[in-house]
Amino acid sequence: KTLNTLENNATITSLLYLNEKDKFNKNLIQISTYTRNIYGIKKLENGVLNVLPISEITLQHIDEWNYSMKNFSDSVISKSFIQLKRAFDIAMDKQIITRNILKNYKRAKSSKKTKKVSAFTITEQKKFIELIPKSKYYMQYMIALCTGMRMGEVNALHYNDINLKEKTININKTISRDSNFKSFINSTTKTKNGTRVIPLNAILYPIIKDFISDKKGKYLFSNDNVISTSQVNSEMKRLTNNLNYNTHMLRHTYATRCIEAGIQAVVLKKLLGHGDISTTLNTYVDVFDKYEKQNNIIIENYFKNNLFLGGDN
């Protein structure tokens, strides 16, 4: 039975919007989380799921929606399905429905091909570095290439985040979007593990030292206007005359060069701010596989020289 007429007519999205607004007003979630959740809810706005009251939704309706989502990425499907399940949980709590038809329901798998990680080859990277000095985002490009930082983290850097004495960068903020999709500097990173201190390498050190000399007490890039990742992406496409290029490639390029140099996955995980090493391994599985044979030869030679053929103890 329903509690009242209003709830009896509640749709999936109306329940979800009210729930997110309530959590945000109670300071239970950050604005960046609120914005991401709202984006997931919007994928439920089109079609029968947003027309009928949730109490009238049947498994057939869910099946139709599920099928319609197959051309989206697994990430989009997963986020939308999480919101869908949440709506039915809310409806159960409010006694709007008496049975949760999604209790054991499985979401659709995406029919889209999984995009492999894109990174510059060494030749492409050299060409890009030769190209960027003329760009207004030169420093952002160089920082991303030399550290693997997300572009949102780069654009949120403050003078105080650069420690020239210790040669480190303190990553503790990012650029997020509010409920109106306007960019702002978020006082926390994308994830808990995104907050990290990374080394300022010898290539980047002299460049950034010169750049920040007149930036004391200021944000390095986002002072009068916050610079969003999409702005830098657009400029990168124009600069390279390649619509397939984006700034996340710079992060992947850094990670790829690290793997090529022999850096262990557990170290790379910390540098990139991944929460779980499986994220690092799964994201760069092809790159790790490429160098597996080389690593096997290194292990083989080590065994020969140190363990089985009279090597030093």
Language model features with spans:
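Short, charged hinge/linker segments at domain and secondary-structure junctions
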Residues: 56-59, 89-112, 172, 297-300
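Catalytic-site neighborhood detector that most strongly recognizes the C-terminal catalytic loop/helix
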Residues: 111, 175, 205, 272-298
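A short, basic/aromatic helix-end/turn motif that makes direct DNA contacts
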Residues: 156-162, 269-275, 285
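N-terminal core-binding DNA-recognition domain of tyrosine site-specific recombinases/integrases
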Residues: 21-96, 226-231, 244-249
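Basic, Lys/Arg- and aromatic-enriched nucleic-acid-binding interface segment
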Residues: 78, 93, 97-99, 103-157, ...
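Major-groove DNA-contacting interfaces characterized by cationic-aromatic clusters
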Residues: 8-11, 15, 55, 195-235
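C-terminal secondary-structure termini that scaffold catalytic or DNA-interacting sites
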Residues: 166, 177-179, 185-195, 202-204, ...
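Short, basic (Lys/Arg/His-rich) helix/loop patches that form interaction surfaces
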Residues: 130, 134, 147, 198, ...
